[in-house]
């Protein structure tokens, strides 16, 4: 599972997930990409599940890039614990996603195969996504 090796602080505030993705909104590495259309959070487990779906479908062909990383800790208190007594411990890690963020990229496969693979990966994600091609200027 993806998570930072070390962080400056163990816990973070919840914060707000506003605006559109400025960075990471262009297809940089591969030929085709899966881009988010809605906003939300992706857990490390969801990112990994979609990655597995992609790699299984393309088999040995093609190269895959994961363009998101879960760097925000989410805390949770244990079951049946009363409120108060401080913040809970870190339960899992999430990546905050804004509309327009490229999630996965792929190269070395046909467009038809890439579309099928991204459709399988998108089914594992809690966001609305779209298929995009690299534009050459």
Swiss-Prot record:
UniProt-listed GO biological process terms: translation
InterPro entries, alphabetized: Ribosomal_uL16, Ribosomal_uL16_bact-type, Ribosomal_uL16_CS, Ribosomal_uL16_dom, Ribosomal_uL16_sf
Single GO molecular function: tRNA binding
Keywords: Ribonucleoprotein, Ribosomal protein, RNA-binding, rRNA-binding, tRNA-binding
Pfam families: Ribosomal_L16
Gene Ontology CC entries for this record: cytosolic large ribosomal subunit
Function text: Binds 23S rRNA and is also seen to make contacts with the A and possibly P site tRNAs.
Official protein name in the record: Large ribosomal subunit protein uL16
Origin species: Stutzerimonas stutzeri (strain A1501) (Pseudomonas stutzeri)
């Amino acid at each position: 599972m993806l998570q930072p090796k070390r962080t400056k602080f163990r816990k973070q505030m919840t914060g707000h997930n506003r605006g559109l993705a400025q960075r990471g909104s262009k297809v940089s590495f591969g030929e085709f990409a899966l881009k988010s259309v809605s906003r939300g959070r992706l857990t490390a487990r969801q990112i990994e599940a979609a990655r597995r779906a992609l790699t299984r479908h393309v088999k040995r062909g093609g190269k895959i890039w994961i363009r998101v990383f879960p760097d925000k800790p989410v805390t949770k208190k244990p079951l049946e614990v009363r409120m108060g007594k401080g913040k809970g411990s870190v339960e899992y890690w999430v990546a905050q996603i804004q509309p327009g963020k490229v999630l996965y990229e792929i190269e070395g496969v046909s467009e038809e195969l890439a579309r099928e693979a991204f459709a399988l990966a998108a089914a594992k994600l809690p966001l609305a996504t779209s298929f995009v091609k690299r534009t050459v200027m």
